[in-house]
């Protein structure tokens, strides 16, 4: 960004998306039967997943990975620690996954990955007196879900070469760029929009937000 500014650009727009998969941080995640959805979806035919596949996560990318694995012949399950209502995936994506034959294992949180499955602990929904919903693990409810391969799909984060290496460009705890409603970042003349700001969303949302930011960039260039 500093080099672009020194080259005379008035405004810079960051829309690099999120391409680094987030990890589960559980024992066994480096085993050879563990893959990341963002990588798998680039070339699914090149993966030999076996007969039974578990996708960990419940966003749109998780649904895409599960449906793709199912269409390629695997008996596919989505493992999620909450309920259908709590899934970040759109209702359309969830319903289409069901129609494709994807099965769902809910209220199960992964603890460890083995060569032949995922160790999990069951969870339950808890509603506090003020109506807030949370989930707690149930002691003694551990089990192992047998599978040949695991696909991790618990969201993505921005690549660090642009975002975290830029001085004065604020990011949140997830590594996403902080902006106002016009896409203005904490670095003068730098704007951002799309998944690099919001995290993984739909293309429609990214395009709609970027149109708003384009107007802000135009206004900035006219006044500077």
Q: Language-model features: where?
A:
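Cofactor-binding loop segments of dinucleotide-utilizing enzymes, especially the Rossmann-like FAD-
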Residues: 58, 81-83, 195
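Feature captures the FAD/FMN-dependent oxidoreductase FAD-binding
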Residues: 1-27, 111-119, 126, 149-151, ...
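General small-molecule cofactor/ligand-binding pocket signal
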Residues: 35, 103-105, 119, 191
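Rossmann-like NAD(P)H-binding beta-loop-alpha module
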Residues: 48-74
């Amino acid at each position: 960004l500093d080099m672009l500014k020194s080259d005379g650009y008035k405004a810079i727009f960051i829309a690099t998306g999120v391409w680094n998969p987030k990890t589960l941080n559980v024992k066994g995640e480096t085993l050879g039967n563990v893959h990341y959805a963002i990588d798998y979806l680039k070339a699914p035919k090149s993966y030999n997943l076996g007969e039974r596949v578990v996708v960990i996560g419940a966003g749109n990318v998780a649904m895409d990975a599960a449906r793709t694995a199912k269409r390629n012949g695997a008996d596919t399950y989505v493992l999620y620690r909450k309920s259908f209502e709590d899934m970040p995936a759109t209702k359309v994506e969830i319903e289409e996954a069901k129609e494709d034959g994807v099965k769902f294992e809910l209220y199960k949180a992964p603890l460890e990955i083995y060569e032949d499955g995922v160790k999990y602990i069951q969870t339950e929904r808890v509603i506090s007196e003020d109506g807030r919903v949370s989930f707690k693990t149930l002691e003694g409810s551990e089990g192992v879900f047998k599978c040949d391969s695991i696909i991790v799909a618990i969201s993505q984060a921005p690549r660090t070469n642009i975002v975290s290496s830029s001085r004065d460009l604020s990011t949140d705890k997830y590594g996403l760029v902080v902006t106002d409603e016009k896409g203005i970042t904490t670095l003068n003349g730098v704007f951002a929009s799309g998944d690099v700001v919001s995290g993984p969303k739909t293309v429609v949302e990214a395009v709609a937000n970027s149109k708003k930011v384009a107007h802000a960039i135009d206004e900035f260039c006219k006044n500077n």
